[in-house]
């Protein structure tokens, strides 16, 4: 079966999710969109050399059973998506890809292989099948880069260099928070780390912080770390960096921003929430993604996902 790789049409997305050096022993026939590796200076010929076929975007939709798109497919591609195709990538069906699921995923019976770092799952119709064969945290390097990149990018666009007098709160202890800590600590500010069990301490001291960096993803859309009421207590000009880009969940009311317009002001506070910040350091993040996905995703035969869905449909009957 054929797995086609598309250039993501997400704003400012420069990551290349498959490098020629990682194309080894795959069972699927790989079809690469023309210019796929251009941002890294990788020619189409380099993909051909390792056994890939080069094709146009439209041809890939027409001829490939599986479609890989790093970010959720946009409306301009909807007309090309065929009934029952396998869509692989960061679709985030319950988050930024919810509209895609409503307009394409469910109506066209698509098999969505969502490569969430912590909970990779297959979405089909109204069913969610955990991919337990993929280890949780399998692309942790990209998450670390997300924390690092978000912090550096936010500070640069906020326009003020942190000092030893700058008070910083970092929420969480996972990969994203670790990356954020690595970045902000270079300025030698006054840093406090808060975890899920110590959030009450954060709430007691909200007014003290100049920068708050979130590295936690919340599963419950109705439960927030920083509510609107909490945010009203923050000091004027406080910079809130949602490095986890959790779209209004961890930080109530926060919205996604873009690399070209990364910060907005609301009630005297500044918010940053770029949901593809690792693309800022796209050379390192491309390698991290390509390595992890090649090992755990691309090497898997597409027939496997069809078999999983067949088992689900048998149970339905």
Curated annotation (Swiss-Prot):
UniProt catalytic activity: N(5)-[1(S)-1-carboxyethyl]-L-ornithine + NADP(+) + H2O = L-ornithine + pyruvate + NADPH + H(+)
Effect of residue 92 to L: Loss of activity
GO MF annotation terms: N5-(carboxyethyl)ornithine synthase activity
SMART domains per UniProt: AlaDh_PNT_C, AlaDh_PNT_N
Top EC class of this enzyme: oxidoreductase
GO biological process, one term: ornithine metabolic process
SUPFAM superfamilies per record: Formate/glycerate dehydrogenase catalytic domain-like, NAD(P)-binding Rossmann-fold domains
Binding site for NADP(+): 172-177
Keywords of the record: NADP, Oxidoreductase
Effect of residue 71 to R: Loss of activity
InterPro entries for the chain: AlaDH/PNT_N (IPR007886), AlaDH/PNT_NAD(H)-bd (IPR007698), CEOS (IPR046951), NAD(P)-bd_dom_sf (IPR036291)
Superkingdom in the source lineage: Bacteria
Similarity comment: Belongs to the AlaDH/PNT family. CEOS subfamily.
Subunit structure: Homotetramer.
Listed name of the protein: N(5)-(carboxyethyl)ornithine synthase
